[in-house]
Amino acid sequence: MQGQMHAVWRKTRNRPISGGGFHGILTLHIPAFPRILMDILKPPRKGANVMLKSIYLQQVYSDLTARDPEQKEFHQAVREVLESLNLMIDSHPEYREAALLERFVEPERVVAFRVPWMDDTGRIRVNRGYRVQFNSAIGPYKGGLRFHPSVNLSIIKFLGFEQTFKNSLTTLPMGGGKGGSDFDPKGKSDGEIMRFCQSFMSELYRHIGPDTDVPAGDIGVGGREIGFLFGQYKKIRNEWTGVLTGKGISYGGSLARTEATGFGLCYFAAAQLKDNGKSFEGKKVVISGSGNVAIYANQKATELGGKVIAMSDSNGYIVDENGIDYKVMKEIKEVKRARIKTYLDYVPSAKYVEGCKGIWTVPCDIAMPCATQNELDGESAKALIGHGCIGVFEGANMPCTPEAITVIKSAGLLFSPAKASNAGGVATSGLEMSQNSERLSWTFEEVDAKLKGIMEGIYAACAAAAEKYGMKGDIQAGANIAGFLKVADAMLWQGIC
């Protein structure tokens, strides 16, 4: 049927349309022509993913890649979601009629702007800033700001798209957004970073607000940067409001926010391990990265009985078979802002290896990629499997390549996607928004207990969605389906907007 329809389309596509019909093999009245058949007559462009079984999904993806062919990271994120929707999309014809997926993969708003600032030598420098407000169907846009030389529109769009699902899974009323700049804070003085942040906020303030868009931190944006950004917003608007999360405790931040993503990752992993008759107890854990997510994943994994034996930064990785002391890592990264090699000054028996990719060759039971996107490829996944790894739990945003995910799942390892297991940070940001709105401050224990409950709830929702649509145990598919359905329902209720 599909091939016949495409043949018809090829024979008629260059003929003129008049009188409301196609001239040639078919003469049909267009207003009465069902949209679903129009989609079938329109052949997928080259590049449509063969794993997308639905013609509708193929068309959505091929149109997307044709529109922005250079945005590879964004394409990867969208394709991964669409593949998970194969088995459920045909039971929802209302999505096609409302062009819901076409709207879902297109941001509501993209803001790009220049960011001029002065360095310590008096030289004027210019960077590019972004804010992608992806979807506000279930709440104000919510998502972090990333300052890193690799930042471009494709990366910010992929992060905003992923954020929409992640926020949906928390069950809190937050839409999806993301922003950032190609500014590199590494090697910059506090004064330079302050001037950059002030310039960045001098444009961003026009587009955000506590009921519109609430940014937070991400790679390159920690407590220092959030403080500078918040101060500039407050000065420009002459108001104190919860417009940013990840703030310092002294000016409206939430206890446990710093620890939230790493702790949440381990709470999710513990729930998935438990559901499969396993636990952290006695397991060797490898965690890539050494930022907030990695450091606090180390702490919680250790508290749950695991032993973290390897961590990394962009220069290399350390191996400590006795277990990496997370307190030492906090001292190195949060106080001294030094490279991970400095760990050897504290623990001479540890080993340091140049280059960060080799960390996945370290034998372990549990792997937690917490550094950056596409850091764990197919070759690395095979190395983990060869050493008896039982599970890969994503802590960074999209850290595993599609090939790696295929290898991991085909080998029967447990796998959790970042949009689910990485949601602890934004969940606690939502709790910070609630505290700011009510002018309250909860204890660390209260926030941590709420976080644990949210992460266990996310796992349960993902597992249930996967089972409902015939993919029991596939937490990646379950996360995509559960996150999508809530936002899709809200979009249908709100009409074409």
Please provide the spans of the model-predicted regions.
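Adenosine-phosphate binding glycine-rich loop
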Residues: 52-77, 272, 385-497
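Rossmann-like adenosine-cofactor binding region
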Residues: 316-415, 420
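General beta-strand structural signal in soluble alpha/beta enzymes
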Residues: 212-216, 239-244, 287, 310-313, ...
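Glycine-rich phosphate/diphosphate-binding loop of Rossmann-like nucleotide-binding domains
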Residues: 256-361
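N-terminal ligand-binding/catalytic initiation module
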Residues: 50-255, 486-495
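Short, Lys/Arg-enriched N-terminal segments with co-localized hydrophobic residues
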Residues: 27-50
